[in-house]
Structure formats: structure tokens, C-alpha cells
Amino acid sequence: MRIHNIRLTSATDKDTSMAFLPLTHVFERAWDMFCLQKGIRIYVNKRPAEIAKIMPEVRPTLMCAVPRYWEKVYAAVNDKINGSPKLLQSIFKWAIKVGRRRNLDYYRNGKLSPLNVGLAYKFIAKPLFNKVKKAAGLDNGNFFPVAGARLADEILEFMHAIGINIVY
């Protein structure tokens, strides 16, 4: 627990977590113990196949997950965007580029982004990403630890670009 307390200092008793992995999974068990020690409210989903329906109801601030969960979120977002009109697809792809520049090139490195990137992110990309995150129940997320297998760089970068803080 000590290592979690050092690395995850922003977790407080005001946070909520969603548990959907089996408790036999060591990652879920360790994460839940950490949450209990911090006083974090844990919602237990007994139907993992329905996680996409339940997430918007719970809207956790923290949640441990295996890469497969994020692969499914990524696929669902891409399916939705690819089924949208061409104009919306173009806007979303442009917004992802802006999000990557702002969140990965600058923000993650502790730098301020150029004015044009910052404004494009604030007024166009971020509101669009907020809608995506809200639909997935990830709009309250502070951070989401991932372990158990390798998460593809493309998915990790996409999630960071839209403002989902995956700790990997």
C-alpha cells in the first residue's frame, strides 16, 4: 500500500471507483484494497458484459482496468465516429490532432501550448471530447491505472489526446 500512497497522492475519500474485474484478478484486488484504505467509494459491477451501460450511471473518478477495456472503448468511439457524416469525421480527426499536440506534446511535458493550439483545444476539441467522455461515463475521471497486459500506443495516445488520464 505504501507505494500506492506515494504515487497516487491525489486519490481521496471524495473519489469513486468502479470494480468490474473479478476479485481473483490481483490487479483488481490490490486496487480495491488501496481504495478501501483511502476511503474511496467502490461500485461493484457484477455484470462485466454490461460495463458500457453502467459506466454512465456511476461515472467513476478512478478505475483500474485491463487494456482490453480500453480497446473496447477505443473501438466503440471509432465505430461511432466512422458512422457519422464526413464533416463530423473530419472535425473529430482534426480535434484529435489538436488534443495530441496540446496534451502529449505540451501539457504532459509541463509546457504551455501555443496560443492557437490552446484556443482550438479549449473551444472546439475539449467540448467535443467532453461529449465523448460523458457518453462513455468517463467525464469525471481523474486517473485510470492500467495493468495486466500491454496497451497499444495508438490507444494510449488517443485516450490522452481526448483527456483521459490513463496511468500505465
Give the predicted meaning of each segment.
Residues 120-168:
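Conserved AMP-binding/adenylate-forming
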Residues 1-16, 23-126, 165:
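Conserved AMP-binding/adenylation subdomain of ANL enzymes
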Residues 14-20, 140, 144:
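Alpha-helical hydrophobic/aromatic positions enriched in membrane-embedded helices and signal peptides
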